[in-house]
Amino acid sequence: RSSRRVMARKVPLGTRAEVTQVVEHRHTLAALDPKFPPVLATPWMIGRMEGACYRAQEPFCDVGETTVGTAIHVDHRAPTTIGQTVVAEAVLEKIDGRFFIYRVSARNGQHPIGSGTVHRAIVNVAKFMEKVRGT
């Protein structure tokens, strides 16, 4: 527990990172079902947002620690087509113990396509995996 508190103090508010993704067919709704249009699927956008959060925080994790998502509140407001580049950004807004709240956004070029918050928690990887396995 003490390492979590120490880490929480080490991560400065405003810490930010970006993840870039060129949209391919496999990232689209059409890859899930051909009835859908070939535009970026919301889960892929959210995945890039979570990736940006992870990239921002991982350098501050102690050995044996990582972060996992605990809540996502995101709006997906505009389509992105195959070949366009999506940039997802995360900025650390708040720390509450071992929980971290990131303001996230995504854009294609200069056009915003989504925004919201992603909450992440610090976990000890070994203990987390024990819990996952039910041991």
What is each PLM-predicted segment?
Residues 8-42:
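Catalytic strand-loop segment that frames the active site of acyl-thioester-processing enzymes
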Residues 18-24, 75, 117-121:
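Generic structural detector for well-ordered beta-strands
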Residues 53-87:
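Hydrophobic beta-strand-centered segment that forms part of the acyl-chain substrate-binding groove
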Residues 1-6:
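Short, Lys/Arg-enriched N-terminal segments with co-localized hydrophobic residues
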Residues 81-82, 91-135:
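HotDog/MaoC-like acyl-thioester-processing domains
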